[in-house]
């Protein structure tokens, strides 16, 4: 079973090899001055980490553990984002009210940009995951409510994500996002780049004020990973020798790193054991990889109206994603077309057809489900609650997009 890892063991810059499955019991820790929730000792499972090759990880899980966690193939009903995140709706409402004020009012252009960015809405999935993990782990530590650190962490994560979108729109020369004109379309490239830089800097300032060195290192690494992912993508355009490992590592940098670091940080602020924190990191990593693979599948299976951009646009730019990488293994003609950088008028349409006919879409779907199943396994060490159930449903929501 193939799985990419963070290129470090949190702070040590080494890879993770999640191998032998072990069992553990959840630790309970009371907080002074606070009533500790009733003690329940619940068996749970966790992974034991050991050094491995940089950037890669292998997972060896007993069959019975997989069968108990593998529920992604049966989704009884469609899940909507609004209903999915209802359990943390109050937390998200508070976050929305705070976001614009966090940007500050020093510069009218930045204020206007903040209105444009945060006013566009969005699912707020990343801060929602912070709240869900925070509340799912809080019971283990006897916390009755989330801390101010949990709340500020969610705000920081959304600011970092938004800053990355501003820069992505500049790099991709995108004119619209969420139905609104992008910052660089309204104010020009220079202002957009500076606005993104400002939001990265502002989020870093709030991050430093959390005064937790482990969380500071985790989230700071995310910003570095964003740049690494963009550079890796730019250096492999139209490269038919790009491997699945290369793709997964790039996807970790661009998507999964933020999710993994934010879910682990949420658990850290709950004060739970290192084992639980590691599992929350792996949940975010596997979920992030699954999300990226699904997005890359939709680039071939949805219409331009659904995508908000032409179908196959990543392929047209030379960005070879999972469906293409799988298709290249069986379709030599596809390599010829990509090597020519679609010089013929109908070559892109032919390439898209080859990706479909080769089974590349099907194999990418299997990869997305594999990562989703791993994410579900990572949640097994949490006590059952509506928050754990919602974290499971986030995995299912993602996979139902390719049903």
From Swiss-Prot:
Residues bound to an all-trans-polyprenyl diphosphate: 177, 254-255, 292, 309
Positions of Mg(2+) 2 binding: 168, 172
One GO CC annotation: plastid
Enzyme Commission numbers on file: 2.5.1.84
Cofactor note text: Binds 2 Mg(2+) ions per subunit.
Superkingdom of the source species: Eukaryota
Reactions the enzyme catalyzes: 7 isopentenyl diphosphate + (2E)-geranyl diphosphate = all-trans-nonaprenyl diphosphate + 7 diphosphate
Cofactor list: Mg(2+)
Subcellular location(s) per record: Plastid, Chloroplast
UniProt cross-references to SUPFAM superfamilies, sorted A to Z: Terpenoid synthases (SSF48576)
Transit peptide: 1-62
InterPro entries associated with the record: Isoprenoid_synthase_dom_sf, Polyprenyl_synt, Polyprenyl_synt_CS
A Gene Ontology biological process term: isoprenoid biosynthetic process
Keywords attached to this entry: Chloroplast, Isoprene biosynthesis, Magnesium, Metal-binding, Plastid, Transferase, Transit peptide
Keyword Metal-binding: yes
Family: Belongs to the FPP/GGPP synthase family.
NCBIfam families: prenyl_cyano
Function: Involved in providing solanesyl diphosphate for plastoquinone-9 (PQ-9) formation. Geranyl diphosphate is the preferred substrate.
Descriptive protein name: Solanesyl-diphosphate synthase 2, chloroplastic
Organism annotation: Oryza sativa subsp. japonica (Rice)
Gene that produces this protein: SPS2
């Amino acid at each position: 079973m193939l799985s990419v890892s963070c290129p470090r063991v949190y702070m040590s810059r080494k890879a993770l090899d999640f191998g032998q499955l072990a069992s553990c019991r959840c630790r309970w820790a009371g907080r002074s001055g606070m009533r500790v929730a009733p003690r329940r000792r619940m068996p749970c499972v966790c992974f034991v980490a050991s050094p491995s090759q940089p950037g890669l990880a292998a997972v060896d899980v007993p069959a019975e553990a997989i069968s108990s966690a593998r529920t992604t193939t049966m989704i009884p009903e469609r899940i909507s984002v609004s209903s999915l995140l209802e359990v943390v709706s109050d937390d998200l409402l508070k976050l929305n009210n705070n976001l614009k004020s966090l940007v500050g009012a020093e510069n009218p252009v930045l204020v206007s940009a903040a209105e444009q960015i945060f006013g566009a809405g969005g699912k707020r999935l990343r801060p929602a995951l912070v709240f869900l993990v925070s509340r799912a782990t809080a019971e283990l530590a006897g916390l009755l409510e989330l801390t101010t650190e949990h709340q500020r962490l969610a705000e920081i994560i959304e600011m970092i994500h938004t800053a990355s979108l501003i820069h992505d729109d500049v790099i991709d020369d995108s004119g619209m996002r969420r139905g609104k004109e992008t910052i660089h379309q309204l104010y020009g490239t220079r202002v957009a780049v500076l606005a993104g830089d400002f939001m990265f800097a502002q989020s870093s300032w709030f991050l430093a004020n959390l005064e937790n060195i482990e969380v500071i290192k985790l989230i700071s690494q995310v910003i570095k990973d964003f740049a690494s992912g963009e550079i890796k993508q730019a250096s492999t355009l139209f490269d038919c020798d790009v491997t699945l490992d290369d793709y997964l590592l790039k996807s970790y940098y661009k998507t999964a790193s933020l999710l993994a670091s934010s879910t682990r940080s949420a658990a850290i602020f709950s004060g739970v054991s290192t084992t639980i924190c590691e599992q929350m990191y792996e949940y975010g990593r596997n979920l992030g990889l699954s999300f990226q693979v699904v997005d890359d599948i939709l680039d071939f299976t949805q219409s331009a109206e659904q995508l908000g951009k032409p179908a196959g646009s990543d392929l047209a730019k030379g960005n070879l994603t999972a469906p293409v990488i799988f298709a290249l293994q069986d379709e030599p003609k596809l390599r010829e077309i990509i090597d020519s950088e679609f010089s013929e008028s109908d070559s892109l349409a032919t390439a898209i057809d080859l990706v479909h006919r080769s089974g590349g879409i099907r194999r990418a779907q299997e990869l997305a489900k594999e990562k989703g199943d791993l994410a579900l396994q990572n949640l097994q060490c949490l006590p059952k609650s509506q928050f754990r159930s919602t974290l499971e449903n986030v995995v299912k929501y993602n996979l139902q997009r390719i049903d």
